Amino acid sequence: MLAKELILASSSDIRRNILEDNGISYIAKNHNFDEKILKSDKTLSPDNLSLQLARGKAMSLKDEFINHVILGCDQVCLLKDKIFSKPLTANKAVNNLSILSGQTHQLIGSYVFIKNGDVLYLSLIHI
C-alpha cells in the first residue's frame, strides 16, 4: 500500500522539479485523460479550458489513488484570441515561436487538487 503522498498527474519534468525544489514528497503518474474533446470545444474560455484540463487530468487518476490528494495541472498559451497547444514536433515549435516572437501573449496556468473526486482547491494564474 502506498503512503498517502501527493500524486502528480503529470510526467512533466518542470512540474516535478517545482515539487522537489520545495521539498514536497510526491508520486508522479501519467494521467489518462483525453484532452481532445475539451480542446475542440470552442465555447470554453481559455481560463475555463485550462481549469477543465487540469481537473480532468487529476480526475482520471481518482479511482487508482483512493484517499490520495491528486494534483492536475495545465497551461494554455494565448495570443489575442488564438490558443497555442503544446507543439508535438520541432517544426511546429519553431513555427509557434516565430508567431509569438515579439508579441505580448499570456500564459494561463491552472492547478487543481482533488481527493476521492472532490475538488479541494483550484487556482488560476495569468502570466
Language model features with spans:
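A short beta-strand-loop structural module common to alpha/beta enzyme folds
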Residues: 27-35
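Anionic-ligand binding patches
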Residues: 3-6, 20, 41-125
